[in-house]
UniProtKB/Swiss-Prot annotation:
Residues 200-231 are annotated as: Disordered. Keywords: Developmental protein, DNA-binding, Homeobox, Nucleus, Transcription, Transcription regulation. The keyword Nucleus applies. The gene is hoxc6a. This is Homeobox protein Hox-C6a.
Amino acid sequence: MNSYFANPSLSCHLSGGQEVLPNMPLNSTTYDSVRHFSSYGTTVTQNRIYASPFYSPQDNVVFGSSRGPYEYGSNVFLQDKDVLPSCRQTSMGLNAQSHVAQEYNLEQARAGTQDQKANNIQIYPWMQRMNSHSGVGYGSDRRRGRQIYSRYQTLELEKEFHFNRYLTRRRRIEIANALCLTERQIKIWFQNRRMKWKKETNLTSTVPGTESAGTPQETEKETEEEPKKKD
């Protein structure tokens, strides 16, 4: 078994008696730089290369011209280089996924805080929209429906109208706060109620006039008939 290290890329195999470096003479000056490293690797004495006693031959190391089971060629380094970009891609993908997950968590937290704020807002009765068909939709082109008042609201408004047909703004604000209505709603209600009251008064005033107009004609006819009977 040869004791020198063999290069797997070389096509020729050197025998024990051939020189390792044929282009250079085997003299002491050539191997001066190698002799002071006698404790490591191979040593050169008497124009021969043999293994150092510090290293014992093993199966996983290549000695001589034969190749062991764990041989490392030039392709190994290329394969390692090819693995690096894939590792970088996977690391970049993991970083992107973690960044997306963090953004999603932040958005969920913001949405939760906004929902909590919306739920904590106190809604007063005057803030609710009461004069629409379904109570939903605030578009300008949406036709407003008729306001529906409760029995309690109508009763209180009728009482107020019985004493005062015209309200001051201060009194209107007080009634609006008491009945959970707006000033505009109370103003419109009083306007409609005054119109209704005027119609009622006009009807009551016209009915007695028609009756009084008919009675004189009947009396005249009766007076004319009485003298004829006497004759």
